[in-house]
Amino acid sequence: MAKFRILVFYGSYRSDRMGIRLANFIVERLGRRGCDVELIDAKAVNLPMLDRMYKEYPRGEAPQVLEQVASKIRDADGFIFVVGEYNWGVQPGLKNLTDHFLEEWFWRPAAIASYSAGRLSGVRSATAWHGTLCEMGMVVVSSTISVGPIGQTLSVEGESIGANGEALEKAFPRFADDLMWWVEAAKVQHQRKPPPY
């Protein structure tokens, strides 16, 4: 099987970030499947609040960090967005990073993994992200992962714990299989016929 390049995006800027556990879990599990996977941490990238999108800079004049992230997005075969929920909404850090780009996202599949400290598992944020990612030109797969309470599901090291962790381990293969099917289909189609725009 071909090795697919998958970017995992995570967006909390908080000091005591819990969602990084889920991001690390996903990166590790995709690595076991032979994927070339990289975590893109919005806090580490540290983009300013959106003023100009990457595409609005003259060619070669965008800040280096935008050039680097744009290149990684263009080279990826698929994406996973690890999303937390803030007051029924999306995390501003991840949304800010995502909004800096547009055409770079086009014609690739994406999956959503949500989490929260509570029992609702960030599902309201996942619902909001679904429409956003579709509008940005991605095909969002139907399988999702929803983790909550995250502190009772994953250890600090990102290992599954307890009954919630067992449920996550059981759900992950279908989630990954769904994304990988679409990743492979999109890659074949890209080779067969260039995207129309």
What do the predicted segments below correspond to?
Residues 110-152, 167-170:
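Short, glycine-/small-residue-rich phosphate/pyrophosphate-handling segment
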Residues 47-50, 147, 154:
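Short clusters of hydrophobic/aromatic residues that line enzyme substrate/ligand-binding pockets
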Residues 24-25, 98, 128-131:
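Short, solvent-exposed amphipathic alpha-helical segments in soluble enzyme
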Residues 94-100, 136-139:
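Short, electropositive alpha-helical surface patch
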Residues 1-96, 103, 160-197:
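N-terminal beta1-alpha1-beta2 submodule of the flavodoxin-like/Rossmannoid cofactor-binding fold
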Residues 152-159:
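Amphipathic alpha-helix from the class-I
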Residues 106-108:
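His-Asp phosphorelay/catalytic-motif detector in bacterial-type signaling
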